[in-house]
């Protein structure tokens, strides 16, 4: 631990409990920010074992990783995890917290008051909530997340699962909506004949009112990518017969 802090976290020290607490809080915050970005773009790590996590808040050692196509919080690209789906998309924030708790357990002998390490877990929870709320605000085109926005996001998550909805296309198309009319998002749905039109139009009316009919489209486009590395794209790249094809 001393070597790690001395070489990678020179602003911290291990001389007392305060130093270790502040160091691990930085790890917790960086981890929370990383996972919020995963959730923003639909990235699924696939194998969130403790040894596949970085104390620098970096995405490493992603094995059977992937990006959501239809918005499905239960999806995982890891076929060995298909029965329990421990590392599914919607579970990633909780798994990151669990992994952080294991890190804190391993360093607890180094602190005089190990119960203080609970402060670090609380810091992760509050940090993730902040990053997650900011993420949703940016994806939906308003600058600040308000408590009443929780219901708007909750209803959106529900609607996205009513009929198979392409996550990437939906949020990118939302950037260009000019009126609260679900027909403008028609290309986002895999089964457009069964779209819950009434539910969507109610939600769009609420969203349109929230953004005062002027969503921050630049902010939305920054946070809603037009392209992600879809699984079929990765397969094409992997099976391309020549280096030239791979460059394409």
Regions found by a protein language model. Give the residues of each.
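Regulatory N- and C-terminal appendages and interdomain linkers associated
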Residues: 84, 89-240
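Catalytic-loop signature of eukaryotic-like protein kinases
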Residues: 52
